[in-house]
Amino acid sequence: LHGSSAASDVYKRQGVCGLITPWNWPVNQITAKVGPALAAGCTMVLKPSEIAPLNAILFAEVMEEAGTPPGVFNLVNGDGPTVGVALSSHPDIDMMSFTGSTRAGISVAQESAVTVKRVTQELGGKSANIILEDADFEKAIARDTFGMCMNTGQSCNAPTRMLVPASRMAEAAEIARAAAEQIAVGDPNDEDTKVGPLVSEVQFNKVQALIQKGIDEGATLETGGVGRPDGLDKGYFVKPTVFSNVSNDMTI
């Protein structure tokens, strides 16, 4: 307090929120955005990934059955260049919450800037695990190799890079190779399967190209490689793949 002046915080709802969710963890990402928005008293328009729309449709049915008032939760299916841009640029949307690729995130930020929306984003990246000299290498590296393949490697927090002391790199590579070769790839309905297919042909081709790029740029292929696993002649299945001797100037 200074004389007759006072400072105060006022908490109020943001208004109408535009929510764009990815395909890799659809139900998780929908609830992570819708729940807080509802709790804060906001209305919302959800645009799920066009690759994984069914989860959002089921979620919308649950919301209706739960008695959500009309107009509070709204679902619009479509792709990013049409529905995503329409939401981000719409003058009646007060806030955008986006999870997905950096490329699409840039578009959301640019379109939202025209109407000075509040924007929150979680964008894709490469997660690195730093394994120090005194760590239990057998346990840590095997765990992280399995973790990298969880959800078919389609997670923003998948430990796709392991940074280890140079003196123990060969040991680490051998542990990772052995762990990767134990991972069963196949039909997700089979209880013995640990890794299913990638989500789409686009992702399959992208991953195959990255594996080939790693080979072409001189990384050491410890196991896996291009092509489908043995016994799988169709579908978007990828071999669990481990590279060593990877430098920062390589694409992978």
Which stretches of residues belong to each language-model region?
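ATP-dependent adenylate-forming carboxylate-activation enzymes
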Residues: 46-62, 75-82, 132-135
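Beta-loop-alpha module in the N-terminal Rossmann-like domain of NAD(P)-dependent dehydrogenases
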Residues: 24, 31, 80-86, 100-107
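Short hydrophobic alpha-helical segments of the AMP-binding
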Residues: 30-38, 63, 112, 144, ...
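Short acidic capping loops at alpha-helix termini that bridge into adjacent secondary structure
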Residues: 16, 70-73
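Substrate-binding/gating loop at the entrance of the active-site cleft, primarily
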Residues: 9-60
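Single conserved hydrophobic/aromatic residue that forms the stacking wall/gate
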Residues: 1-7, 11
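ALDH superfamily catalytic-core signature
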Residues: 95, 103-251
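A structured beta-alpha segment of the ubiquitous adenosine-cofactor-binding alpha/beta core
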Residues: 74-97
